[in-house]
């Protein structure tokens, strides 16, 4: 079992915060500081976004964070260089669109990851049918390709998506982009329970989670949550103490 999956399988109430690399007043020089803060608060893993000019899955908060990072000339190459010098016991997960990886060179990308604490990849615009672009390069590495599964996807398709998954399953709680609040289906709990029965891999719920009420709800029917827009917004507004308190409360339900 790879590190990311082992880490998330060991406990309930997993909390995975999302941050945008380079969205800091000191740009990438602030990345280590943010990772250490999130680790010390009790995060199970940390998702790190790569800024991209056409972020189809990102809501306005994360899209603006990406634009701020791009304005500081943050790139995938610079992010990977920064991560090489960061030591953390918490597995990192890179969230990137496929184009930056393709431009960087897939083999070079994976080789660079091996010099970092990155243990997982989320590529939202890479469908299951195209995973062969990535998987042959990470099969024997301690790196997982994490699938996103919409809870409105037919069960037959969900089975296809999770059959050989590693790390965790990213359950998309709403239709649309990240950060979209109060749009949860009444059937969501049932859908999460159904998805969890299809796999032994931890299922984490994300998209639109912004309150402790949301966290408590999803911790009951999945292995934990991924919180992006709220974390990105609070960090941008220099509310680090609020972030720490939110994570500490979230993991102690």
From Swiss-Prot:
Cellular component aspect of the GO annotation: cytosol
Top class in the EC scheme: lyase
EC number of the protein: 4.2.1.20
Active-site residues, record numbering mapped to chain: 47 (proton acceptor), 58 (proton acceptor)
Entries under Pfam families matching the protein: Trp_syntA
Keyword line: Amino-acid biosynthesis, Aromatic amino acid biosynthesis, Lyase, Tryptophan biosynthesis
MF (Gene Ontology): tryptophan synthase activity
InterPro entries per UniProt: Aldolase_TIM, RibuloseP-bd_barrel, Trp_synthase_alpha_AS, Trp_synthase_suA
Pathway where it operates: Amino-acid biosynthesis; L-tryptophan biosynthesis; L-tryptophan from chorismate: step 5/5
Catalytic activity: (1S,2R)-1-C-(indol-3-yl)glycerol 3-phosphate + L-serine = D-glyceraldehyde 3-phosphate + L-tryptophan + H2O
Free-text function comment from the UniProt entry: The alpha subunit is responsible for the aldol cleavage of indoleglycerol phosphate to indole and glyceraldehyde 3-phosphate.
Family according to the record: Belongs to the TrpA family.
HAMAP family the UniProt entry points to: Trp_synth_alpha
Quaternary state and interactors: Tetramer of two alpha and two beta chains.
Name of the protein in its database record: Tryptophan synthase alpha chain
């Amino acid at each position: 079992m790879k590190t990311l999956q082992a880490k998330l399988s060991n406990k309930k109430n997993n909390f995975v915060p999302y941050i945008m690399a380079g969205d800091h007043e000191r740009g990438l020089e602030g990345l280590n500081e943010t990772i250490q803060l999130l680790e010390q608060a009790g995060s199970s893993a940390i998702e790190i976004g790569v800024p991209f000019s056409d972020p189809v899955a990102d809501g306005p908060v994360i899209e603006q964070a990406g634009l701020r990072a791009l304005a500081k000339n943050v790139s995938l190459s610079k992010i990977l260089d920064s991560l090489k010098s960061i030591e953390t016991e918490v597995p990192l997960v890179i969230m990137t669109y496929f184009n930056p990886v393709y431009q960087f060179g897939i083999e070079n990308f994976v080789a660079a990851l091996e010099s970092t604490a990155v243990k997982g990849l989320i590529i939202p615009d890479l469908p299951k049918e195209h995973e062969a672009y990535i998987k042959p390069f990470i099969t024997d590495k301690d790196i997982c390709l994490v699938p996103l599964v919409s809870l409105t996807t037919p069960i037959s398709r969900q089975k296809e998506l999770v059959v050989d998954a590693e790390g965790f399953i990213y359950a998309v709680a709403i239709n649309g982009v990240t950060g979209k609040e109060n749009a949860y289906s009444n059937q969501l709990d049932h859908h999460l329970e159904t998805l969890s029965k299809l796999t032994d891999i931890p299922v984490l719920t994300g998209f639109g989670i912004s309150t402790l009420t949301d966290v408590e709800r999803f911790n009951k029917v999945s292995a934990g949550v991924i919180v992006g827009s709220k974390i990105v917004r609070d960090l941008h507004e220099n509310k680090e103490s609020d972030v720490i308190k939110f994570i500490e409360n979230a993991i102690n339900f």
